[in-house]
Curated annotation (Swiss-Prot):
This is Probable GTP 3',8-cyclase. The lineage of its organism: Archaea, Methanobacteriati, Methanobacteriota, Stenosarchaea group, Methanomicrobia. It comes from Methanosarcina mazei (strain ATCC BAA-159 / DSM 3647 / Goe1 / Go1 / JCM 11833 / OCM 88). [4Fe-4S] cluster 1 binds at C40, C44, C47. Its EC number is 4.1.99.22. S-adenosyl-L-methionine binds at Y46, G89, S137.
Amino acid sequence: MKDNNSGKNSLFREENEEEVLVDPYGRKVTGLRISITDRCNLSCMYCHNEGAECCTCGPVGNEMSPELICSIIREAAKFGVRKVKFSGGEPLFRKDFEDILACLPPLKEVSATTNGILLEKRAKTLKAAGLDRINVSLDSLDPEKYRKITGAPPGTLEKVIRGINSAVEAGLTPVKLNMVLLKGINENEIDEMMDFIRPYKGKVILQLIELMNIDPELSKYTIDSKTLEKSLEERASEVRVRHLHHRKKYMIDGVEVEFVRPMDNSEFCAHCSRLRVTADGKLRPCLLVHDNLVDIGGANSPEEIEKLLRLAVSRRKPYYTPIMKIEKLKKKKE
């Protein structure tokens, strides 16, 4: 960062002749995770709804317009943001999702997370509009267990599987299957899920997700992650480590398996590079903090959007550090 711009650009640094968003702790913001709706057609037992207070099938009126979403992304892209992930709620509830994708600036990767129910008929149009790849939530291949976890009506699981097939055919690959592990419900289905994925020959990846501990009522479903990781490592022919969060990938009998720890750890916070946007137009510096949001919903110019992006980045602070985590655990015990 040049000295003569130190006042104006205190939250930016120049890298390869490009200014990038950097928070007060030196963490670059290179990605946006944008919730484009709070509406959903499932009621998953573990859902945190991207930090919103609750899951909802509420009104459309408070959702950001395609124009605002694209304006936010365009401004962020000017300052080094290269990856965008769309989520919800269920993003495919937005009938104008393809319009949003079509107006985006050039980016390294555009992805989305979906429950897959509406994916079958839209996979091709999403790909044509600019979506690069997709994550699909699939916690069980057993219809009864799937219903218990998601609250879905009969026949829903079959729709999701057809959606996965359509996504692969459309080229939204690699498709990542998000499987939240729940003790006593689906933790014994990992091998079955790997068998399901294997015929896709690398076009589908399994992401095993440790339950995020945000509700004491769900603590009984938390798995023994250390035992699981040890088992995966013993079976793997190769283990790779992703630079971000030091997340491990295991190659097991032709299937790529990635283990995703919850966000309530210091490793995640130390490497966090994302800024989140809520469905009603608020910048969320941290998923786990609710009182530092920046309202960008009323922004009507690129300059105003840039100003609000800077403000949100200035409020980014690691929620967990090793010391903070110990203190929080002590408070819980008290």
